């Protein structure tokens, strides 16, 4: 399929009834080729470049597959194998989940006329979309992270959150809930075992209530145990 512009002009020149010397016609066509933009002279290269660009954009929609595989292998025994289709399925699920939560958090920011999505926006979006069971454990991790990063000055006398051997949360009714030591930073990992497994965490004792309301009905005395990266033994 021919492009417009100079191609149409060349047809009129070649089909002209007035004869022209062969040398003059050849020189004219060569000059015409030099006048065209480089992309017209190399259509195949342009087409391939466009396909590569589309491919890159498609890949940018997903979390890198190497990261997905690394996360999957943390929970699997050493001898386990992962098929390619399962890797791609998890990759698409994780990427879709990130987009789902981020989009909801972004809508909240737009309503409040803010440009920066905060961790609180993400937790709010997760709660609104029905992922309530993740809120309280992730909130604890967030407090731990911020304290160790020095972003918040937390003291025991202030009352809201304090750190001793673990993370202690004071609830509105005055009860205290202690969460076990989280290990060194930056190695804040999710639990790697399925012992009383709930949403990536391992609980001993009563499982904590994950609602954002702060109720202590199910959370009193619960401990979140975070293990280093280890392998299962079947």
Swiss-Prot record:
Main location: nucleus
CDD domains: HFD_NFYB
GO CC term (a single one): CCAAT-binding factor complex
Annotated spans, Subunit association domain (SAD): 90-101
Annotated DNA-binding residue span(s): 63-69
Localization, UniProt: Nucleus
Ranges of biased composition (kind: Low complexity): 213-222
Disruption phenotype: Altered response to abscisic acid (ABA).
PANTHER family the UniProt entry points to: CCAAT-BINDING TRANSCRIPTION FACTOR-RELATED, NUCLEAR TRANSCRIPTION FACTOR Y SUBUNIT B-6
Stated role: Component of the NF-Y/HAP transcription factor complex. The NF-Y complex stimulates the transcription of various genes by recognizing and binding to a CCAAT motif in promoters. Plays a role in the regulation of the embryogenesis. Involved in the abscisic acid (ABA) signaling pathway.
This protein's name: Nuclear transcription factor Y subunit B-6
Organism in which the protein naturally occurs: Arabidopsis thaliana
Gene: NFYB6
